[in-house]
């Protein structure tokens, strides 16, 4: 059985491949998400939704990422890190049922596995700053399971 971690890894790979080849997003989605995750429809559906939402949100996510990636232009960030930051930012903005801590932790762990030795720390710093800023702006709209851990974010935002 596949997990949401598997889904996120496949979406990261699909975003990366799509960006590197300027390819057909639907073809990439089919090859890199639908086929590997075919055995678990709920995981596949989550992956497809995350991929599509990340593409739709990319311009907004890039602006947010650049604001918090001190001294980094979006195109200079390692491609895998960029894909992960876009995914995590999209989850924070658009996935009401996903707790922010899950989005952040998953991005960090996937960065450690697939990117450079320093990527986990870099992704952590950027996405943490994004998380606190979105909270301060009232843009974290979480419901149900997505509310898990929100009290910790509120405490951290109050102390910064």
UniProtKB/Swiss-Prot annotation:
GO CC, alphabetical: cytosol
Molecular-function annotations in GO: RNA binding
Keywords for this protein: RNA-binding, Transcription, Transcription antitermination, Transcription regulation
Gene3D superfamilies: NusB-like
InterPro entries hit by this protein: NusB-like_sf, NusB_fam, NusB_RsmB_TIM44
SUPFAM superfamilies noted in UniProt: NusB-like
Domain of life: Bacteria
GO annotation terms (biological process): DNA-templated transcription termination; transcription antitermination
Record family assignment: Belongs to the NusB family.
Entry function: Involved in transcription antitermination. Required for transcription of ribosomal RNA (rRNA) genes. Binds specifically to the boxA antiterminator sequence of the ribosomal RNA (rrn) operons.
PANTHER family named in the record: ANTITERMINATION NUSB DOMAIN-CONTAINING PROTEIN, N UTILIZATION SUBSTANCE PROTEIN B-RELATED
Name of the protein described by the UniProt record: Transcription antitermination protein NusB
Organism this protein belongs to: Salinibacter ruber (strain DSM 13855 / M31)
